[in-house]
């Protein structure tokens, strides 16, 4: 796992969940975070490889890093405004 992922402020385990649950959980968790904090998401649903980057763009958050070559997938999100 990349060193970037080790410094996450918050973590969310979405392994075993299927669309749309992972993105719904990310949205709920990010709402409780302060601007600039980071969230490490672990998921194994292939749809997250499309849905989480789209969520970040739509909600003006930054997808700092991702590992999507094989499950479990990992995403590091920095909360925007």
From Swiss-Prot:
Cytoplasm as a keyword of this entry, yes or no, is yes
Q: Which UniProt keywords apply?
A: Cytoplasm
Indicate yes or no for the key word GTP-binding.
Answer: no
Active site location: 19
The Gene Ontology terms for molecular function here are: sulfur carrier activity
Query: Biological process GO terms, please?
Result: tRNA wobble position uridine thiolation
Compartments reported by the entry: Cytoplasm
Q: What is its main location?
A: cytoplasm
* A Gene Ontology cellular-component term: cytoplasm
Record PROSITE patterns: UPF0033
- Which CDD domains does the record cross-reference, listed alphabetically? SirA (cd03423)
Q: Matching Pfam families, A to Z? A: TusA
Report the function annotation for this chain.
Answer: Sulfur carrier protein which probably makes part of a sulfur-relay system.
HAMAP family, from UniProt?
A: Thiourid_synth_A
Q: Which family does it belong to?
A: Belongs to the sulfur carrier protein TusA family.
Name of protein:
Sulfur carrier protein TusA
Native species of this protein? Aeromonas salmonicida (strain A449)
* Gene that this polypeptide is encoded by: tusA
């Amino acid at each position: 796992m990349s060193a970037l992922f080790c410094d996450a402020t918050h973590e969310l385990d979405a392994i075993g969940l299927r669309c749309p649950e992972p993105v719904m959980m990310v949205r709920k968790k990010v709402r409780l975070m302060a601007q600039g904090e980071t969230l490490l998401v672990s998921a194994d649903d292939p749809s997250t490889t499309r849905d989480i980057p789209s969520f970040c763009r739509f909600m003006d958050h930054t997808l700092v890093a991702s590992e999507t070559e094989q499950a479990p997938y990992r995403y590091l999100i920095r909360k925007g405004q």
